[in-house]
């Protein structure tokens, strides 16, 4: 593939380098075959390939009152595609290739019912270890070796749990929690989002003609980021992040026809 954003940076760099000549009138910027090869190398990225291995089991226990899923995986990736800040100016994003990386982990899930089917519950957990095996960014003295660093944007842990209890045919109470482990935002692992959890709850009223649901999300108003980048376009490294949703509450009404 080709990075449109990076090609824009190449054009901007050449225009700045030749602006004095261009201001005098029409001007053709000369290019050699080596120049075109260098540009192609700069803006192009290779396809990503991977070998994936997975083993797991699905169990129904206690007369289907309890369901248990367990799996383990291993993935070997070559030319892993990474989204990074683009070019000299740091605006926009582009795709680059890391040399090699691997990911391994486990996933487990439990779900079941109690009290004659009135109480539904579920919980899940996932662990992922994703690291670079070979990745050198840049050339010569400016080269940076990321071997052994965690692959960015991959949370190391994910957890979730929920429970719903039907008090009557028309009233249901429920709660849920979702958690995400440490997530690095850059290849060098210099900044990250620490583990956080988001709590939610709902009360459902079920009638023949309509349903009403009162709900709340992020009840503890947890402060967390869903995405972060750094930028050095001004000469000083700055960090920018997208905040996760704060406390929210609302009412949903659904009519049946």
Task: Identify the residue ranges that each predicted region occupies.
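Residue-level recognition of strand-loop junctions within catalytic nucleotide-signaling folds
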Residues: 1, 60, 113, 208, ...
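Membrane-embedded beta-barrel scaffold of Gram-negative outer-membrane proteins
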Residues: 1-6, 10-95, 102-104, 117-121, ...
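Flexible, surface-exposed loop regions and adjacent strand-edge segments
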Residues: 4, 11-19, 84-94, 137-146, ...
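Outer-membrane beta-barrel proteins
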Residues: 41-45, 58, 94-98, 111, ...
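Surface-exposed coil/turn segments at beta-strand junctions on protein surfaces, enriched
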Residues: 46-48, 61, 114, 154, ...
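Residues that define the transmembrane beta-barrel architecture of outer-membrane proteins
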Residues: 49-53, 102-106, 149, 155-159, ...
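Gram-negative outer-membrane beta-barrel transporters
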Residues: 65-78, 94-187, 254-256
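C-terminal beta-signal and adjacent terminal beta-strands/loops
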Residues: 76, 178-186, 204-257
